[in-house]
Amino acid sequence: EKEPKIVSFYTRSDCYHIMLKMAQLVKARLGCPIIFAGPQADIIARETLEEIPFVDFVCCGEGENTVYPFFSSLLRGEPDLSVYGLVYRKDGDIVMNPRPKLIEDLDTIPFVDYRICPEDEPANAQIGFPIDVGRGCPFGCTYCSTKTFWGRKYRLKSPKRILEELQHFHDMYGISYFAFEHDMFTMNRAQVIEICRLIRELPYKVYWNCSARSDCIDEELIRIMADSGLRWIYLGIETGSPRMQKLVNKNLKLETVLPLVKYI
């Protein structure tokens, strides 16, 4: 029904093969520029353009710094090939522009505009409405793309800004259950406690979930989070084998994990 001028795909390793098939079909039918972004295409940007003829560009780094300015130039009919993080073909070669710097202050990013979505509630009641509360993880687990994509730099939006987003989406869509999108939400204990305090002061009840490492959370923090509406928490334990913990550079103290899980 629609004839888009650009089609972009957010890529992950677990579904990259599906994205490739979809992109191939879109290119064959519409002929519009195909752009890949996200962690999988970011890591293999050169290989993607060398091996996949129907992908025209790869945007590396944070979308606000790369995808947005490049898309804007394409829609103007004046592609800006100087955008940091852009990877493209030129005269048979692959050109990889310098990677953009990470956004220092995530509070400067505008709220996501969901008005173009269908009119029904843009949230999954089972997993929560996703809000980007921060980015990055300082740890170096060998299997994880986070350390490569975000550069092992931990960033968290301010408690005030996170609360403003909760209120905004609650007031606009009536949403009361949120998924706090961050690989390591509990890294900054003081900030997490302040976020929980602000949530408790809301005139209505909200619920939420998050992700954390088992060595960056304890019973006291769990109680504080639960009192502010925490419904469940995803703990990245990965393996119960001490040998495998070392091999993948996770290095958790496994003897502390089971008591914590039982408490949760």
What annotation goes with each model-predicted range?
Residues E1, E51-I52, D80, P138, ...:
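Alpha-helix termination/capping residues and helix-transition junctions
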Residues K2-L102:
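Glycine-rich beta-alpha loop elements in corrinoid/cobalamin-binding modules
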Residues D107-I264:
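Radical SAM [4Fe-4S] cluster-binding motif and immediate context
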